[in-house]
């Protein structure tokens, strides 16, 4: 299992969204996408998830073009920064709606409820849940299709310390199951705790790609947090 990104580009009204960007991700990697607001991090993930289309370039998973929406649903799970759940529906109904839309067996919904310790909350409406539980539902929904690749946009945004630690454990468990994970982050401690590799975007361009040790010893890291 591997991702190949070649010349992926997105411009917004002639402004930088993502300049031509190329890199690959191999099975077993947990990649942090780092950079300031507006660097292109979310744009990159949304293109990989087929939420937005690139102006040019392409991305592939095991030779399958991610512009193919059916392939994306099967191969890629996307967890946006703000959970896009139906607040007035229950946890279980949110998952069942997604499963129905993509013809996922109902047994998979029950498995996700169990795996993510959501059974006690299955009849709760989303609006009744804490931020941490909402994020757990958000992640569970992304895993309903059993994707090979998971994309997380600022996964701990708005979570308190205990919720953040719980989410770290959950992400590590998902990674240990053999999935590729890419996540965006502003937090140095999050990158240290999770990433096996770090990619830095600046003003839409890729300026660093290396190990956590290389990153934290680099001028790129110093400049990123000095500015």
Region roles according to the model:
Residues 161-163:
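Helix N-cap at the start of a conserved alpha-helix in ABC-type nucleotide-binding domains
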Residues 34-36:
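The feature captures the beta-strand-to-loop junction immediately N-terminal to the Walker
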Residues 49:
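Helix-to-loop junction immediately C-terminal to a conserved catalytic motif
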């Amino acid at each position: 299992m591997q991702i190949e990104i070649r010349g992926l580009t997105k411009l917004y009204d002639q402004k930088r969204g993502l300049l031509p960007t190329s890199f690959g991700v191999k099975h077993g990697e947990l990649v942090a996408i780092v950079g300031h607001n507006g660097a292109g991090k979310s744009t990159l993930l949304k293109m990989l998830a087929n939420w937005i289309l690139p102006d040019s370039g392409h991305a592939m998973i095991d030779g399958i073009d991610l512009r193919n929406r059916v392939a994306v649903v099967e191969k890629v799970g996307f967890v946006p920064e703000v959970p896009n759940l139906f607040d007035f529906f229950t946890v279980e109904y949110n998952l069942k709606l997604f499963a129905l839309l993509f013809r996922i067996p109902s047994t998979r919904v029950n498995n996700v409820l169990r795996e993510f310790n959501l059974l006690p909350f299955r009849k709760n409406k989303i609006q009744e849940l804490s931020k941490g539980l909402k994020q757990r539902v958000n992640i569970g929904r992304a895993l309903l299709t059993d994707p090979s690749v998971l994309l997380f946009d600022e996964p701990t945004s708005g979570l308190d310390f205990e919720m953040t630690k719980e989410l770290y454990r959950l992400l590590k468990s998902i990674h240990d199951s053999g999935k590729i994970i890419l996540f965006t982050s502003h937090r140095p401690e999050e990158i240290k705790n999770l990433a096996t590799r770090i990619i830095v975007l600046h003003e839409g361009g890729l300026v660093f790609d290396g190990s956590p040790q290389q990153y934290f010893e680099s001028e790129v890291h110093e400049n990123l947090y000095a500015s």
